[in-house]
Amino acid sequence: MSAIRATNLSKRYGGTTAVSDLSFDVEPGQVTGFLGPNGAGKSTTMRMILGLDRPSGGSVLVDGRPYGELRHPLRKVGALLDAKAVHGGRSAYNHLLAIAQSNGIPAGRVNEVLDAVGLREVARRRVGGFSLGMSQRLGIAAALLGDPEILIFDEPVNGLDPDGILWIRTFMRKLAAEGRTVFVSSHLMSEMAQTADHLIVIGKGRLIADTSVQEFIGRSSQGYVRIRSPRLAEVAELVKVGELYPDHLRVTAMNTLEIGTLTARAGIPLEELTFVQPSLEAAYMELTKDSLEFSS
């Protein structure tokens, strides 16, 4: 059984449709990246999963039932939607203790999750003085309090420095390796390429792709050979295929050996002859170009 299942999920706010007929499954034991341009409906979808917004149509189930019907929701699902949605005057320890006590979770679990996210030494400090990275760690600690099987993170690496991003990436991979379900939204394609096993991509509230990372990249984009030369126009005329840019030529129909042989025979010097691998970012931009809320 899928950990999360959305079926024909829709959400309308007045005359605006935020999510439209969206169906997907999120499976355990892997990190599933949830991608889409600003305004695509990612946060709205996560809120419906967690019972914070009521769907206008369709349904979404968590472990086979609506979130509101879970007997002990925090023991089944942990979520981080807004790292700063915390009372700034409370200490990290007291913030977590209040959540634990209101959900029937033993107080001893607070120190366990503080240790897990590396905040034990600052547990008595007021949250209002925390950096964004520390706040993100505290939010993850709160999500882990009930030792849940399913974790939902909305943009957990936004605004973090490289060390913070690396920590969250490693931590999410660890959670998935334990057999948990990790469902995470992000705008950082390079990060998702290193973190996610599977991708669900939406645009304007509709499903665009539901596939593995490698299948997504291979299906949506292809590699190319990048050529730089002081005689670039001659190279373009020689190969007769490719896209000519001001400072380089892109060729997809020939490999580096073929191009190198041709240009050597013609006596044309090359400054660069490189095969550029397809990337998640390039595939994402190609697939979502018609779903951008704003574009230049």
Per-region residue spans from a language model:
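ABC transporter nucleotide-binding domains
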Residues: S2-A6, K11-V184, M189-G203, A209
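Solvent-exposed beta-strand sheet faces enriched in polar/charged residues
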Residues: T7, R228, T274-V276
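A generic structural signal for secondary-structure junctions
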Residues: Q101-G104, V213, G218-S221, K240, ...
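ABC transporter nucleotide-binding domain
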Residues: R169-M254
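C-terminal coupling/interaction segments
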Residues: N255-S296
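Residues at or immediately flanking beta-strands
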Residues: S59, Y224, P269-E272
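Alpha-helix C-terminal capping segments
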Residues: Y67-G68, L74, I99-G104, I227, ...
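Small side chains
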Residues: A6, G33, G242, G260-T263
